[in-house]
Structures are given as structure tokens and as C-alpha cells.
Amino acid sequence: MTNVPETIRKRVDSLRATLEDHNYYYYVQDDPRIPDAEYDRLFRELQKLEAEHPELATEDSPTRRVGSSAETSFEEVIHRLPMLSLDNAFSEDELRDFDRRVRDRLGADGAIEYVCEPKLDGLAVSLHYENGTLTRAATRGDGYTGEDITANIRTIPSVPLKLRGSGYPDLVEVRGEVYMPRAGFEKLNERLAEQGEKTFVNPRNAAAGSLRQKKSTVTARRPLELCAYSMAVTDESVLPETHWDSLQLVRDWGFRINPEMRKAEGVEACLDAYNELMAKRDSLPYEIDGIVFKVNRLDLQQELGFVSRAPRWAIAHKFPAQEELTIIEDVEFQVGRTGAVTPVARLKPVFVGGVTVSNATLHNMDEIRRLDVHIGDTVFIRRAGDVIPQVVKVVPEKRPAEAPMVEMPEHCPVCGSDIVQIEGEAVARCSGGLYCPAQRKEAIRHYASRKAMDIEGLGDRLIEVLVDEGMVSTVADLYRLTKFQIASLERMGDKSAANLIAAIDRSREPVLWRFLYALGIREVGEATAKGLAAHFGTLEAISAADEETLQTVPDVGPIVAGHIRSFFDQPHNQETLAALKEAGVTWQEEQVLSADEQPLNGQTWVLTGTLSGMTRDQAKEKLEQLGAKVAGSVSKKTACVVAGEAAGSKLAKAEQLGVPVLDEEGLANLLREHGIEV
């Protein structure tokens, strides 16, 4: 052994202790004490020192958590104490029977105290420590023989490589569940999908697959955690009197124990714990499939003993399954209120997640292709809480011969309009926006909104009633409504009806860009609508333009041009436009000005304060007619600030930067000078 300076030895020991402390606070206590960058700096320093002085490297060093590229053989391990499974209870009656058996066997008249632990949906493991250092880790296997996974377990940050504190026995075994949190599972699957690799069906499979990687470097990159649930020692004199206290001891040694764990006196309290945990099941950051009840006193556990392959002093009360197998009998396509066309699997009814499920979403055609779904397939269905049931995996070996593939229809199943899918988008959509009954309410809501036709008093609830009562089918029908019809509706009197009819009448002569925006063409917002109106001047010119011509308008690319062209190509939409004209809706043509003819072209203006003669939106609209871009903040590039009453920080900043300022009268004069009505 070479002579390593004592200062180096002490620094290595100090770094190891510091890093393990921070691992403990970060991964076990969820209480980070230093920034990630500082942890990384200390970690790299330890790596460097161990590389320079290999004789200082130890098996319990934090640097061992990064894993090794050497392949693991998973040698057989015989458990000194069998890792027995638990009996299950699937109903309240079965749990009551368990409690009765416990009390009868113990001859107990009163209630038994139990420890209630969430049953994590992961992989059970056994960890052996000698003199406080992790020496071996193994899977449960068949309960008597498991596999050596020591190299992979070392990579899990919440597993102590060396026990904390002092006073622990020379030999100790800690058992726990390795699991993958929901957030980590989702990120892992996203990464695997991006790399073109096979994704995991659920977090449990992901945890099991990650723990059995032949190269521990792969395991090190997987977001695994460990939660301890029991301990065993050769010298039982060091054990506390209860299971609860033994877990507190395990926690003091540096392990994470479940914060949802609690004590319960008697079976009724156990049932309360079960119901409370089931209610919050879907909000937990990890998946659980039940709750484990254990007799708390260790002497009573010993008296109760074991039967066959399970202890008499514990039982797992399982939650309703969240995944089940069933068969896809058909696939139908639904149209949402925004026109999204979604494939829905019609299933052979199956009880899952506490309810009978006969439908499940397939999301889109990309997902159907990824899963390789055929009609007649046997599939795994998953339902968690209020989440819509979904197909998560196909069992291809059970596929019937000549099972048909799922194909996207060419026409909307509701209105018959073309179904379009823009390249690069996962969602296909019905192009019959103004006409399609499935999109009716959303189309009317958008048409009446303040930034579109601004029909005051026509809110969501009234739109629901008008459509549901059959009084309105398209936006054109709004202009055929009468005061009598409106007044006859619940909670609508004569005055409200008169006000609404007046608001509808006021919307008959919109400026072109507002009408264009009101049509609800996909991805045509206010700015794009203004650009189209200014460029073409008339709705007829816009509706006749091909995609190439449409793309000459600023901010209109191939995708938006495709949406515009698709909208005007649909006969149903043209019929609705004709009906609007017939109902007396006319839109003002815009004077088409070249950039040179727009006096404020290329300038950025800012509005601040209160204007008395017009609203801020009206002022913005008039400035945009002159070619200005109206921004929300002042900078050196601002051409001018219009300051109304009670102008605040924007005015102060303009004065500080030397930006010209106009009052409301100055703005009015500017607009009149260029022929804009004030």
C-alpha cells in the first residue's frame, strides 16, 4: 500500500460522510440542505481523490452509486429468514375474520393494536448490513431463494450504504420495497419513447425491470426509491417491544419509512385507515395497491407465528384492481367540442378500479399504432381514480386470426365534414367548425366572446340552454331569435331578453378582422385575423386565396394556411356564412394599405393609463390600422407612449428613456390626420 498523506485520508472520509448526510436529507427526509451544484462539486472531488488513490476506495463510498458497466450475474441467495408472502383480504368481512382469528388465537377480549402501512406496488428486497455496512442485497424470489442484486441496490440514493448513528447490531437485515415514483416513471417512459425503446406498462414493471439490469450503470439512471417495512437481527435482545418502534429505529439508521403509516386500535379503526388511504390513493406520489395491517406487539407476533407461507399476524387488505384484462370489441370515433377526433375502444365489460368499465380512450392514431391495436385484441385496461380508463398494453399472442386494424375515418362521424390532420400534430380534427353539432356550443361561445362579436349577455349557461332547447343550431340562428323566445326561458325576463336581442343586433356589422376571428378557424387568433384582414381587405379574397398566397401574410405559415384553406373548403361552413349574410350580418371591408402607406408601420407603441374617449382595446385597434404594433412594456425601441389619466410606471420609464409621449388629445389628432374615425 502506498503512503497516502493523512490530510488526503481525512478529506476522503469527510467527503464521504458529508455526501451520505446530504443523500439522507435529500432522498429520505425530503429536506435538501445544499444546492445540487454544491453536491455535484463535492461528489466530483471525491471521485477525483479515489481515482488518484485507488487504495482508499471502499464499497460503501457514495461514488459506488453511479454503478458499473460490468455485467451482473444475479447469483442465487438463500434467505436466512424466509421472505414470506401475506394473505389477502378483499372485503371488510375478510378483514373482520382476520381480526377475529387473531383475537381468538391470543385469547384477547379487547381490541388489538395494529400498524397500518401502505402496500407499495413495487419489488420486495432484503438488505444485509455487517457492522453498519451494506454487504448484500437480494430479491424476494420464491421467499426462500432470491437473486443477488447488491450492485444495483447500491445505486439507489435512498438506500444507506452505511447505517447512520451508532448502537446498531453487528448483523442486521432490513427489508423494504423498491418502487418507482409516478413522476419518475412518466419521465423514464418519455425518454425511452424518444430513444425508440420499449416503454413500461406501469411503475411496478419499471421498478422490477430496472432492478434486474445486468449493468448497474443502467439501474443508476432509473428513478428508484426504497421504503423500509421491517427489520430482523440475530440478537433479539436489541429489538424494541413493538413493530412501530422497530421502524422508528430503522428510520434513525437512515432509511425512509412511509409517512402515511399509522397505528389503529381494533378492526374498526383499521377499516377507517383503509378508507382514508384509498380516498387519497391517486394523489400520492407513488402507486399503492392496498394497506398492510400488522399486529404491533412483537411478542404477540411471535405467539401467533406462521401458517404455510404467510404470517398469522399480518394481512394485506387490497384495493380494487386498477388494471384488468379484457377484449376490444370495436373502436368508434368521438368528436370533441373543439373538433378533436378521438378513438374510443368499446370493451367487453370488466370490473376495474371499483367500477365496471366498457369504454376506454385510445387517445389518437399515433397511440393506436404504438400499441398496435386491432379489433378483437385482448388488452390491459387501466383505471386510476377519476382518470378516464385507457388501454395500456396489447397481448398479441391472444390476437384472433385476421383481426382488423383500426383506421381513421375520412369524414366526421357526426357531420360528414372532412377529417384533417396537419403534419406534425397527433390530433385529427373535424373541419366543419361552424356546422358540426359536436362543436356547436364551443363555436357559438367563441363567436359571441368579447374579442370576437362581443355579444354581451350571451354566456355559457344561456348558450347551453339555447342549443339544448333546439333554438340555436349554428351561429346564424342567433340572428333569428326573438324577444318572446328569450323571455320564455327560465330566469330570463323581458328586460334581459330585450338587452340580449339589442346586443345581437349590434353585432351585425363587425369589422372584418373581428368577424374572421369569430369564425373560430384553428390557430387564427386576433393578430393573425388582423393581418389577414389588412392584407386581403375582404372575406371573399381570403376565402379564395390558395395556401401559397395565404403564406404571404406575416405570421401565416403552412400549418395555419392549411387550417384556413380547410375551413373555407368545407361546404357546410360556406352554407353557414351564407346564412349569416341572409340574416343581415355584414362586415366592413378593410382598406388594403401597403407597408409604405401605413404611417406607423414597423413602430412599437405602448398604451398606459385610462382613456376617456375610447377603450384601450379601441385605441389599440386604431393604432394597428396605421401599422403600429402595440406592446405591453416600454423599452428603448418603443416609438411612442400614449398616456391617459393615472398613467403609472410605464410613463415614468418612457420619460427616463426619452421615449416620446402623447396624451389622449394628441392620439386623437394623429388618428384624424390619417383618416381614422375617433
From Swiss-Prot:
InterPro entries documented for this protein: BRCT_dom, BRCT_dom_sf, DisA/LigA_HHH, DNA_ligase, DNA_ligase_AS, DNA_ligase_CS, DNAligase_adenylation, DNAligase_N
CC per GO annotation: cytosol
Keyword Cell membrane carried by entry: no
EC number: 6.5.1.2
Domain BRCT, residue spans: 595-678
Catalytic activity: NAD(+) + (deoxyribonucleotide)n-3'-hydroxyl + 5'-phospho-(deoxyribonucleotide)m = (deoxyribonucleotide)n+m + AMP + beta-nicotinamide D-nucleotide
Active-site residue numbers: K119 (n6-amp-lysine intermediate)
A Gene Ontology biological process term: DNA replication
Binding site for NAD(+): D36, A37, E38, Y39, D40, S85, L86, E117, R140, E177, K294, K318
Chain positions recorded as Zn(2+) binding sites: C412, C415, C430, C436
Pfam families reported in the protein's UniProt record: BRCT, DNA_ligase_aden, DNA_ligase_OB, DNA_ligase_ZBD, HHH_2, HHH_5, Nlig-Ia
Keywords: DNA damage, DNA repair, DNA replication, Ligase, Magnesium, Manganese, Metal-binding, NAD, Zinc
Cofactor: Mg(2+); Mn(2+)
Gene3D superfamilies: 5' to 3' exonuclease, C-terminal subdomain, 6.20.10.30, BRCT domain, DNA ligase/mRNA capping enzyme, Helix hairpin bin, Nucleic acid-binding proteins
GO molecular-function term, one example from the UniProt record: DNA binding
UniProt cross-references to PANTHER family, sorted A to Z: CHROMOSOME TRANSMISSION FIDELITY FACTOR 18 (PTHR23389), DNA LIGASE (PTHR23389:SF9)
Role description: DNA ligase that catalyzes the formation of phosphodiester linkages between 5'-phosphoryl and 3'-hydroxyl groups in double-stranded DNA using NAD as a coenzyme and as the energy source for the reaction. It is essential for DNA replication and repair of damaged DNA.
Similarity-based family: Belongs to the NAD-dependent DNA ligase family. LigA subfamily.
Protein name in UniProt: DNA ligase
Organism: Marinobacter nauticus (strain ATCC 700491 / DSM 11845 / VT8) (Marinobacter aquaeolei)
